[in-house]
């Protein structure tokens, strides 16, 4: 979904997408990192309205991220003071040729245990 949008932007300009898109794991991680940071900054600008955006504003922007899906390449992400991962989701994939094929749904392993450990550490 989001990768198709990127390919369409390149195609519109008569170009091929970057060859790095073929190695989907690393490319997708980069897309995810950029998209999450952009969403945090958008939230910061929306919350502040005007004036200079500070690091604290962006931090609050991260914490305002709720149910962020990025066009289907990840489960709904939610950030909190204790959870900067976005929810602790995982998914198992199998390599078939040049592709990664999901063989499980998105799962959350022992989230209650992880959150309790984080609370004890703070």
Language model regions located:
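Extracytosolic ligand-binding ectodomains
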Residues: 1-122
């Amino acid at each position: 979904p989001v990768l198709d949008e990127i390919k369409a932007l390149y195609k519109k300009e008569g170009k091929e997408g970057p060859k790095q898109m073929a190695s989907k794991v690393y490319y997708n991680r980069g897309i995810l990192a950029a998209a999450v940071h952009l969403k945090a900054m958008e939230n910061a600008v929306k919350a502040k309205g005007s004036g200079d955006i500070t690091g604290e504003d962006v931090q609050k922007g991260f914490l305002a991220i709720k149910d962020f899906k990025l066009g289907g390449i990840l489960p709904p992400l939610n950030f909190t003071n204790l959870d900067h991962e976005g929810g602790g989701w995982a998914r198992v994939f199998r390599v078939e040729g040049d592709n990664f094929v999901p063989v499980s749904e998105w799962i959350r392993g022992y989230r209650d245990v992880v959150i309790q450990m984080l609370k004890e550490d703070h």
